[in-house]
Structures are given as C-alpha cells and as structure tokens.
Amino acid sequence: MMNLFFSFMFCMMCSSLVGASEGPLVKLNNGVQYQGKTEHDGDSFRGIRYGQSPEGVLRFAPPLMYAPPTDGIIDATKLGHVCPQSSCTNTGCSEDCLLLNIFTGKNATIQAVDSGNLLPVAIFVHGGSYMSGSGNLYPGGPLVNFMDGKGIVVTINYRLGALGFLGSSQLRAVDCTYGSTANMRI
C-alpha cells in the first residue's frame, strides 16, 4: 500500500505537465488514473479511497485494502463523505468515508524530482477526540504554501467514535492485535 501511495505522490508531481486546462491527470504504475483539479495555489486530488467501504458486514471489522479499478478515470475533484459523528446532520456523512485528499503546491514540479530533490510530505490527521472532525475541513493549499509551494499535503478521513475505536472481547476474537475496529492500522 505504501508503494502505491508513493507512486501516486510521484505521479501527482508529474501531473502539472498533463491536462492543464481540465486539471491534472495522474496515471499510476498499476494503470489507475485520477483526474484532479487545478486551483490558485496548486493541484488537488480529493476523495481518494484508501480502504474498502466499511459498511454492512465490514462495519466493525478491521479496514480492508481497496483495489481501485484500472479502467477509466477516477474523478478526484470533489471532497468525499465525512465519517458519521454527532454533528452530522446533512447528507455529506456516510460510513463510506475511508478517503483522503492530496494537495500539491504550484512549485511542486517534475523538475524538483528530476534534480534529485525530494519534496516534503505533510500528513495531516485531524483531531476531535476520536469523535468528530474530518480531513475535508482543512484545505491543503494554504498548508502547502507554508512550504513555499514545493510540497505535498495529505488530509485523511477515518472512522470515528464506536465505528472506529470500539473495543470488545468479540472484536478481540476477530483481531487479537488491537481488540478494536483497528483504526490504528490505518
């Protein structure tokens, strides 16, 4: 999964050369393509799935890796669902929320990689006492600007409350490592 993540990050840096009028198009080594969005402070890829939807029988199960389709282009221009929480009163909340957002600065280009300079990557995990919040609330563009536009910011949505941090003997029987829904693995 980490190789896929870093491949995606590298391809995002290359994306400024492709599809400038419609936003960046990234093609990973495994054939998966993501259509991003160009904004005033850089490029963004939003609502990228990193785990299978934890609905139904997977509700309290440890997260499972997601295998994206390799045909077609995945729209990564819109924010995904927020994980259920007490403050959710709109239709933007869903258990299908294991999503992340990736932002690159306008100075994060292929030239930086070609010259052997690695770009900094900041992974922002929101707070909220494991009960509330979302990576969608934090725009990555301003955070990238703190790196002079030469970096990458990742924000993440993760299961909250009992759906993400419930512990019990029944769950321990399924996954003795954590005895919970295993958000700690993500």
Which positions does each model-derived feature cover?
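Classical eukaryotic N-terminal signal peptides for Sec-dependent ER targeting/secretion
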Residues: 1-12
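Extended, hydrophobic alpha-helical segments in both membrane/secreted and soluble proteins
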Residues: 183-186
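Non-catalytic accessory segments of hydrolases
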Residues: 14-179
